[in-house]
Each structure stands twice: as C-alpha cells, then as structure tokens.
C-alpha cells in the first residue's frame, strides 16, 4: 500500500486526500482482524498484492470488476440455484429488502392505503357472513387508542352449523385427490403474496409485529402452502403399491380423517393459522378454523383468499371468538375427527382431557406448546456472535416466540465479559412503534400479557440480581409495552414456568459441568428449542446427545425455523409432534387404508407372461 500511497498523495502527484487508519485495541480483539486483513491483502486476486507484481498488466489491475462480470456469457453458476429455486419441488417465498429505502417506501405506501379503511371480520359459515354473535372492537397493541377494525364473534349455534356443514363436504374433498387440492394451495400462496401490503398492515397493527417480522410471518405462511401442496401431490394422489406374492395386489392409500378443528395462537397469526389449515386441507380433511381472539382480522383475510383460490366454502369454515366458549362446542361435536392446536401447555392438557372423555372414536390431537428454551455459551464461543444471537433469540418479536430463549447458561470463565457485553447491547435496543423500521422491540399482545410479565419482573427484582431493565419512553404510554430485562439467577430452579415476553434469565455454570446443564433442562419436562455456542465439536456432540429437545441450533440464533429445511416442534411438555413443515406432518392428519386383491380370481397375474 505504501507505493500506491506515494503515487496518489501530494501536490506533485494526483493531489488526492487519503486516510490512514490504525486500529487500536487489545490483543484478543485485534488479532483476528489482523489475520483477516493479511489473508485479504495476501490473496493472489488482491488489488494490493497484484499492484506489487511487475509482470501484471496495469490494464488488468485497474479493470472495473462489474464490467468484467457483465462480459460473462452466464453470470449465475449453473449448479447454484437462485433464491427462488433453492427448495427442490416448490418456489421459495418472496422476501423484501427492507434496508433499501425505495423498497421500504413502497411497502409503507401500500400499508397506509390498506389502513385507510377499517377492517372487518366475522364468522364464515359456508362462505356466508354470520353477524349474530357479539361485536367487538379491535385496537392496536402499540396504541390502544387506535381502532383498526371490528369482529362479529361466532356464537355456539354458528359453530355447530360450521361443523355439520364441514362434515358433509369432507368426503367429496377427500376424493378430489392431492393434485387438485395442491393446485388450490399453490394459487392461495400466490394470492397471499399479491396481498403483501394488506397482510403487513394487519400483522403490524393488529399483532404488534415489526415490519421485518411481518414479512417473515407472511413468507412462512406462503412456504407452508407450497410445501404441503408439494407433499399432497406426492403422497395423496393415488395408492402406493406394496410388495407381495404373485397372484395378489396390495395397495396403501392415504385419506383425510374427517373434520379438523384448527386452533391457532396470536404470536404467529398468519403463519401458524395458515400452516394448520393448509396441512389439514392438503390431507383431505375439511377444516373449522378458530383463530386467536386477539387476531381475527388476519385470519379472516387468510380464509377469504383461500376461498378465492378455489377451496370450497363448505370445506373451510371460520369461527372467530372466545376460546373457551367456542372450544367447548368444537371439542364436544360428534363430527370432530381431529384437533391441530398451538398454544399453552395448560390449554393443550384441557383439550386432551376433553377428547379422551368423549364417547366413540377418540379424535387425533396434534399439539405444539411452549418451552423453557435455553442457550448455552461456553468459553470457546465468540462473545460478539453469541451476544448477537442472544439478543435475537430473546428479544426479537418482544420475546413472543415459542422458540425464544428464556434462559442463558454462560460458562464462569467468560461470564463477566459476556454479561457485560449483553448489558451494553441491550441498552441500545429501541422499544416503540413496530411500524418504525428502527424499532427493535414492539409491544406485547395485550394487557393481560403485560401485567403478567411485569409481575414476574417485580419478583425477579426482589429475589434475584438485576442485570438491566430498560426504561420505557413516553411514546409507549398508550400501548401494552414491556421493557426488555435480564436477570441473573442463582439457579434454574428460580424460574418456575415459561415467561412469554422480553425477559432473559442468566445462569452461570462451571466449565466441566455442561452435563449438569443438560440434565437440568431435561428435568423441566420441556423440549422445544436449544441454542449452543461452542467451537468444540465434542461439546456440541455431547449436548446434542444428552438434551431431549426438538430443535437444536449451534452457533446461531434459535428462532426463525424455515419450512422444509428446519421442521419445527418439540417433545415432552412442548408438544406431541410430528414437526410442522416437515416430511411426516401430513401423515398425522391422515388415515391409512390398505386394499388386498386376489388377482387369480380374474385370470391370474398377466404380468408373468411378459417376463
């Protein structure tokens, strides 16, 4: 670089100003940086390296790399798929470059247009509006003075009619075949993406999601539709021939079980709501969907588009309203064949007991519940990377993810540094309106959630050590906001239950006791997600072997499972399985039938004559 500097700086040269910089810091901070720069500048293709090569033509050295790439006949590598084609058999969902001002401005303009008119939702019984039930205003969690729409909740009679109609329609839907059903799901995926701004508006204002979380929620819904459509074509499109002796033909086919009640949560009001009904529909079931009380507007828009995509209105019914009241009718109805549920462990247990107490066939229960999710950071981990991933895992979506980290186990040797770095990083989190791109943490869903979290924080302040508890600004005074907080616990026993919000609990552990950490996590009975930061392969192998957990993430955050790539679901108190977005999920919605035919009765096996 010195030779280049001498050619550029000075009045008798090119008279161009140059900046000289000298990184300052400790050995542990700067060594990695120095090695990286040495590797970059020492590479054969490096500008600095080639500049010192007397045999290298100047024209080659100063050539514009963009111009050189444009000369290539084929810029993409033929064996590296483009983002839209990374998943074989289906199109990837569309993302949005929110960091780009023009892209973000276009999205915001569409959101403003969508919010210009209040939204409405109501029960859809055979596609017809049911306006008999109670009317309720829907306000935004970031500002309860902002009314964004209203919902007519279904009454008990409407729920019963929905179940009866869905039962009558199910057989024809099952007989329509996987290819026909898949075409409708694929069409629905396209309609969802065509309504990105409308969904984003609702996800931000009704559910309190940030802009990037809103886009991610929509993308996951689209991925569910296309993934289950792909599976329906492959596995629900006719019988599979099984092996057997000559003179006999054995076939196995998959069929819908009947009517599925799909009961979804508010934290992923589009993705999980869509995933449940898409899986049930793809498998040949009819569906009665019951969305969370907090997010009926999003559910209504989704069902409306599913009907527009061709799903028969009698096959897909919508019954928004109070969970206990509607759930009682759904679970007791004789037409019920299965329940897909995502929510609390307590509610899942109530559903399970209600199903077991029924007379007749016991409906199938597919439940995904919560978890005492932890991240383990040992002394070999990169502190900056670990803290970055802890922030995302614990505080993204205001900690309102099933997969969010509730516990951070950090090794004694590095605990002081990691906790100090975490405290500093948390101090920079911006809490506020989720519509603002700079916001890191938005509101929690409602006043009940806020009150419960504040009560827990008060107990932690009284009984444990406070690391940091962020203040809330005046702009948060009209919403249900909870300031992010971190507490250091004396042991995991101090955490009695899952805390569903932006609160992190830190526990130190000795370097030779990682096995004890695994045992403590298993002892909770939960098994949803686990994060691990280590550069020691044997540690990763031991933790993977010992911890009973559905989804484990190594040296990354533990949120944002991708459909088809990271099937999601837990074990133990965290759910029944199988995993949503995985190859075995649809099978749980289906029943198997085998037909064995004696071919000798019609003349034997003619295929033998052509051997």
Describe the residue ranges of each PLM region.
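Long hydrophobic segments that form regular secondary structure
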Residues: 1-10, 16, 412-413, 418-419
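Residue-level signal for inorganic ion chemistry
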Residues: 145, 166, 181, 203, ...
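A short hydrophobic/small-residue beta-strand
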Residues: 286-288, 467, 551
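Rossmann-like NAD(P) dinucleotide-binding subdomain of oxidoreductase/dehydrogenase enzymes
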Residues: 204, 234-387, 577
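Hydrophobic face of amphipathic alpha-helices that form TPR/SEL1-like repeat modules
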Residues: 39, 44, 49-150, 168
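ALDH superfamily catalytic-core signature
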Residues: 305-311, 332-333, 338, 346-490, ...
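Glycine-rich loop-to-alpha-helix module at the N-terminal edge of alpha/beta enzyme cores
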Residues: 132-139, 144-236
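Conserved C-terminal structural/oligomerization subdomain of aldehyde/semialdehyde dehydrogenase
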Residues: 17-24, 30, 35-58, 141-151, ...
């Amino acid at each position: 670089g010195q030779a280049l500097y001498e050619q550029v700086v000075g009045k008798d040269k090119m008279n161009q100003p140059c900046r000289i910089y000298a990184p300052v810091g400790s050995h542990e901070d700067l060594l990695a940086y120095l090695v990286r720069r040495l590797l970059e500048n020492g590479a054969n293709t490096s500008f600095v390296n080639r500049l010192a090569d007397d045999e290298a033509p100047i024209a080659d050295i100063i050539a514009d790399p963009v111009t050189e790439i444009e000369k290539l006949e084929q810029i993409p590598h033929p064996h590296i798929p483009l983002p839209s084609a990374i998943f074989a058999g289906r199109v990837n969902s569309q993302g949005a470059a929110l960091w780009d001002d023009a892209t973000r401005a276009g999205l915001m303009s569409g959101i403003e247009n969508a919010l210009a008119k209040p939204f409405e939702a109501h029960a859809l019984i055979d596609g017809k509006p049911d306006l008999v039930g109670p009317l309720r205003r829907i306000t935004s969690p970031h500002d309860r003075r902002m009314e964004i729409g209203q919902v007519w909740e279904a009454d008990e009679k409407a729920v019963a009619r929905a179940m009866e109609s869905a039962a009558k329609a199910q057989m024809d839907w099952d007989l329509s075949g996987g290819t026909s059903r898949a075409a409708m799901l694929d069409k629905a995926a396209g309609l969802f993406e065509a309504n990105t701004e409308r969904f984003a508006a609702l996800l931000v204002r009704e559910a309190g999601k940030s802009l990037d979380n809103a886009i991610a929620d929509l993308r996951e819904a689209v991925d569910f539709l296309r993934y289950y459509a792909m599976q329906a074509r492959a596995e629900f499109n006719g019988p599979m021939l099984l092996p057997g002796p000559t003179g006999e033909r054995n076939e196995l086919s998959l069929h819908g079980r009947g009517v599925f009640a799909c009961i979804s949560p508010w934290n992923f009001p589009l993705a999980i709501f869509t995933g449940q009904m898409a899986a049930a529909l793809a498998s040949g079931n009819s569906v009665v969907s019951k969305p969370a009380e907090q997010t009926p507007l999003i559910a209504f828009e989704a069902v409306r588009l599913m009907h527009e995509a061709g799903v028969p209105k009698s096959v897909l019914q919508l019954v928004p309203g109070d969970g206990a009241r509607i759930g009682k009718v759904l679970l007791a109805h004789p037409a019920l064949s299965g329940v897909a549920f995502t929510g609390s462990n307590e509610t899942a247990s109530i559903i399970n007991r209600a199903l077991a107490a029924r007379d007749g066939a016991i409906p199938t229960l597919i439940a995904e519940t919560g978890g005492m999710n932890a991240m383990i950071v040992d002394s070999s981990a990169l502190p900056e990377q670990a803290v970055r991933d802890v922030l995302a895992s614990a505080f993204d979506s205001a900690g309102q993810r099933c997969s969010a980290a509730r516990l951070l186990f950090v090794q004694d040797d590095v605990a002081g540094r990691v906790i100090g770095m975490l405290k500093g990083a948390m101090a920079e989190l911006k809490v506020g309106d989720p519509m603002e791109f700079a916001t890191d943490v938005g509101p929690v869903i409602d006043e009940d959630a806020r009150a419960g979290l504040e009560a827990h924080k008060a107990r932690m302040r009284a009984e444990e050590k406070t690391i940091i508890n962020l203040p809330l600004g005046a702009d948060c005074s009209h919403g249900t906001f909870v300031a992010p907080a971190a507490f250091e616990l004396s042991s995991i026993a101090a955490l009695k239950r899952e805390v569903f919000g932006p609160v992190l609990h830190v526990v130190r552990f000795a370097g030779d006791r990682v096995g004890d950490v695994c045992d403590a996590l298993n002892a909770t009975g939960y098994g949803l997600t686990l994060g691990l930061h280590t550069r020691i392969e044997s540690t990763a192998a031991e933790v993977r072997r010992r911890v009973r957990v559905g989804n484990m993430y190594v040296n990354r955050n533990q949120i944002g499972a991708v459909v088809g790539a990271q099937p999601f679901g837990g074990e133990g108190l965290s759910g029944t399985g199988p995993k949503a977005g995985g190859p075995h999920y649809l099978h749980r919605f289906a029943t198997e039938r085998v037909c064995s035919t004696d071919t000798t009765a019609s003349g034997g096996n003619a295929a033998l004559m052509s051997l």
